[in-house]
Structures are given as C-alpha cells and as structure tokens.
Amino acid sequence: MKTSLRILVAAASLGLSAVSLADWSNLGGNARQNSLAAVAGPDAATATWTRSDMPCLIAWSPITEGHRMFTVRQTYAWAPYEPPAADALVHCLDIRTGVTLWTFDCPFEPDDWSTVVYGARDGRVYVGRGGNGAASAARVHCLSAQTGAVLWVSNDEVRTAANEGIAFMDDGDPIFASHNEIRRIDAMTGATVWHSTRTCSVSGHCGPARDGDAIYIDETAPSGQRISRFSAVTGLRQYSSQTMPGFLNQNSPFCAPGGFVFYLRSSNEGPTVDLFYAFRDTGSGFELLWTAPTRYEPFARHGITPDGGVTLLSPLGHLQIRDQQTGVLRAESASPVLAAHGFTSSLVAVDSRGRVFHNNSNGAGDVIGDLRAFSPTLSEEWRISVMGMNQSPALAADGSLLVTGTDVLHRYWSAPCANADLDCDGAVNGRDLGILLGAWGPCAGSPCAGDINRDGTVNGSDLGVLLGAWG
C-alpha cells in the first residue's frame, strides 16, 4: 500500500528529516529509542542474502553504520560463566553482500559476561562484557568500524546489558544506563564525562532515551515506577513523573519529537495497572496525556510512526497504532500477533513510509518467531518465521531489513525509488511536490525529506530536479 501525502508531510513536521543519521545506531535505532528509521524498508519477503554458517545459542541485535552491520553470535551461555575463546565474537558484515569483514574477540575477565555491541556511530563501535542483569561490570572497548582495531578502552566499567542499549549525544558521546547508574563517556578518549545514580525496577532492562538535553529513564517509586529526566549535559536529575502503580517492570521508555515520552508499564498484574503511558515533557515536569490498556510484554521495544502514531499491543494481542497526543486508536491488526509459545516481546522497526515490521519472538533460542510486515494501516503484507529471532529487526541506511536468528541471518532489501519520486508511487507528481515544499529549508541532519541533491538544504535546486523528472 502506498503512503499518503499526509503521512509523509507529517514526517517532516515531526522531525523525521532531522534525525542525525539513517543508521540503526543502537538497540532502539536512534537516540530516542523509538524504532523509527529515515529509510523505506523492503516491499517483499525476498532475501538478498542469507548466512546459515554462523549458528549460535543467542542472536543479538544487529547494529549498523553505512554498509556495515555489527552483531554478536553468542555460542556459550552456561553458569558459572567461564567461556572458551571466541564465545561471543563481534562480527562485522558487509550489508550489501553478507560477507564478513572482520571479527573481534572482546577480552574476558573473571565475572564478565557475554560480549554486547552497545552501538555504533562516527566510525566507532562500542562493545563490552558488562551486563548479566547488572551483576557484571566491564570496560567499554571502542573499535574502528572499518577494521575492528581497538581505539581505546574506557577508564571506568559499565554494567549496561544487551537489552538496555545506549543513547548517543549529537557529538557522538555514548550514554550508558544500568540498574543503579547513568554514565556519559567521551567518544574520543573513553573518559567518563559525568556519572549519576538512579534506581530501576529490574536490572538488565533500564535503558536510556535522549531528546536534546533530556535523558529519560524509568525509576522505582513507592508502589510503582516513574519516569525521570536527567540533563544530558551535566548528568543532574531534574524532575520525575507521577507514580505509575504496579510491582516490577521490564521495559524502558522511548520518546518522540515534541516532548512525548512513552512507557509500557506491564507486569501481568491485571487491567488496572498493565497500561501504556503517554507523557509530555513540559520543560518543568511531566504531563500525563493518556493511558491505554495493554498486554504483558517484558523486554518489548515499541516505536513511533512518521505521522504521529505510536505502536503497542492490545490486551488481546492485536498490534495497534494510537495517536501520540490523544491516544485515539488509529489502526489495529486484524489478528493477534502473539508468540506461539510463552510470552510475547514485541520488537518493531518502522520505516519512513509508516510501514511497521513486527517481531513477536520472546528471545528464546529454540523458539520460532514471526516477523510480519504491516502497511501504515496495519494490514499484513507479508511474514517470515525465524528461529531464535532475538532483538531484531533493524533497518539500515540503504533500507535493508536485517534479521538475526540463532540459525540464520537474513537481509531483505528492495531497490530504492527514483530520485525525485519521494513517495515511491512510481510517478513524480503533485504529491512529491507537496513533500518537498513541506520540508523546505535547511536540513538538521541527513537524510532529509525533499533534499534530492543531498546538499543539506531543500531549496530551488531540488525543486528544479523534481520538475525536470515530472511524470
């Protein structure tokens, strides 16, 4: 289904054109951790390559920069954790071909855990062996994205786990969060810029989201949880939301342009407390906008759509899109999207056309999960089934949909649209003109809607190219 003009113009107004990079740079795809990509994903379930020669026990998230994908294939997971060599190699693959470019065996010290690829940006890949809840602390190794060479090792250890992820500052500094702390590390040297304490409900699921100077995390509160804002510049705590009732929670917040902050607070305690929360950060506090009943989903990662929607599951397991500001239901899948066995942990990637790629796996290495592709109105377009599909999918800068399972890795990709065909409908017409005019002016980042010649500004030069391709 082709995307409407309304969706694409709204994308520009909501800041899709201002994303700093088109790469899937961390667990949630971007600093806001909202799983929205600035590229169009594949139109069909046709794999351009598959790797079946890298089996593992646990398949971790694919992280991308340019034409490179970074991921860990964990082959050892027994306690006590005394792994053999190469138990959790970092693999760098060429996204276009699937060929391995380099591997890295992160040094192991007693009490360390499996290697994690935390994120990648500006030619640097951040990996380490912290985590295991928050039981393991380890130094961060910064690698060259091109060669895998070690650029530096951090001064301090972090306890950030694979399910938490990091958030990048605009200057590239990574921000790590774990059960009891937040830490900003200098991207050039590995030195700690600042360190703050926090509290979190369950270790291993305490990730940060960043929007401008604001870092959003979840914290424990009397008889529940709350969202707290910290300064990304100083690390100082600024203010917190009201308490969201409930016992434990195993999800992290994510955010959207305009001050929206979302939190899936569900712990299988019933309809009065298993709720999806939408807040607005007013600059001095949090305003509760709405709540919606939802399903118990530990370790889930939902996302936003380019036209101002946000995804979640209904109590019966239907995928929904609700309005970010009002909570009004916009779309719902015709059927539930639940895992066949055990609990469901939704993992989504949303492309620039508003299409939602939904993984219903619960991360178990021996469980087959379904990855469904939905239109912006949540009509199912296609699906695939993959064993042990933990933490994927991811959308790379060229529109590749990357899927990591315990037995295979897949790349799904469709050829991009013509340069001036901004809505990918096969014609250059008034709809494309509307998109270009809606994005008129300087781009805050790249890619930028309407910037056809990629010079950083949507202007008369782009208009000339569009008019020259009319038809």
What name fits each language-model region?
Residues 22-60, 70, 89, 97-108, ...:
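Aromatic (tryptophan-biased) beta-strands that constitute blades/sheets of beta-rich domains
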Residues 12, 17, 415-471:
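Cellulosome-associated attachment modules in secreted, modular CAZymes
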Residues 1-9:
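Bacterial N-terminal signal peptides that target proteins for export
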Residues 24-28, 57-88, 108-140, 157-182, ...:
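Repeat-blade elements of multi-bladed beta-propeller folds
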Residues 42, 94-95, 120, 144-145, ...:
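Short, acidic, Ser/Thr-enriched surface-loop or helix-capping motifs
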Residues 87, 101, 122, 137, ...:
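Surface-exposed or flexible loop/turn and strand-edge residues in extracellular/cell-surface modules
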Residues 92, 142, 184, 229, ...:
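Conserved blade-register residue in beta-propeller folds
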